[in-house]
Amino acid sequence: MNYDEKIILKKVQLPYTFNDVEPVYLTEATMEQRAKKVLDLMKEDNFDSLVIYADKEHGSNFEYLTGFIPRFEEGLFVLKKTGQASFILGNENLKMSKYARLQGELYHYPLFSLPNQPMENEKSLDSILSDIDFSNDKKIGLIGWKMFTSTQYDNSAIFDIPHFIVEAVRNICTIEAEIVNAAYLFIGGGKGARTINNANEIAHYEYGANLSSTSMLKAMNAVEIGVKESYLGNLLNAEGQTNNVVTIAATGVRFEKANLYPTSKQLKLGDTLSLTTGYKGGLSSRAGFVVESAEQLPDNQRDYLEKVAIPYFKTVVFWLENIRIGMYGGEFYKMIEEVYPKEKYHWHLNPGHLVADEEWMSSPIYPSSKETLKSGMVFQIDIIPFITGYGGVSAEECIALADEELRNQINNEYPHLWGRIEKRRYYIQHELGINLPEHVIPLSNLVAYLRPFFLNKSATLTCVK
């Protein structure tokens, strides 16, 4: 794209949506591949054991190997370099070990249970870990969810799991044993096991990307003066699936009384509106105004389209047309900053990040990054400008990078998914005027679909060729 190419608000057809897509389970072959990837990385970096923590909010690394999270309890999964696996679970998750995708020895630790539940079979965590045996381990990785990336501290010595667990591991190891944060083995952009997805995993995650974008379009189409935030919030949640972000349906002044959730507040003409929903595999987010045309904008924001929405949309188009497999994340970051200067538009987060079970897993796109963008990575387009005196703008959606081999695998193994991808591609190219490269496969139905005026439901920003 020529960055100076003309952008106009134009009447277009609504994007395709798909309402009856069934979830895709991860296959046994995929789960075996996941375990092998982690074991290979353990060998490469000389780890004897990994101790992986999980709770409801921080369970993705645990779930990557086991297939489940311990919901309202805590849990530990211990993986030895030999492949030996152990589960340490509370009262209400003992049954889950027999359903786990990777089998292992079960240890009951009732202190992982909810307060005041029975403490039968109580045994110290030190004792359980001693039974698993770390006595000969020279290097142990503790993994919660977060990979720390401080420029001032030793990231390997910062742990995001409860202190009593860290202390128990220290107590049962030899003095010489090295204990480090090893989350990078899972989510590090350079080589983390979870950063690259096969065809089965992309099909698995596309379910959530399709669901979030389908729900988003339903909510956008329901925007009317007088509609309540809670009504839109209900449309954003679908099929009983657990969100991986807080659902947002917020109009006018946000965060009143520190509230984060949709309320009974009604939409008014001229108000700002933010909508967000997300599931495993992708988030959809929109921000704009409850108006039909620029004439209905607040007097001091009549140029919102020219000052805010169009420059943002141009950058989304540039992002899609210029991201490449094999480029450094730092190179792409620099390209985005050149066409959408931080100094002018005041964005400060990464202009794109990896997506998986969690909405933001990690990002190879940061200043001077030498992490390579690879086939199989699933990305969220995530650029958040802050322009003083103006309402916000957003069109966050999900894509994957796929080389020819991966595209052929998806086509052959999941032809219905490939059909959806092709319909989305056609829409992006022919309705929105974007030259979408073959290696960029849209997992969301609303990639680059931006309606800045919510009451004008037929007009979106497009590229004029």
Residue ranges, per PLM feature:
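Active-site neighborhoods and metal-handling regions in enzymes and metal-associated proteins
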Residues: 1-465
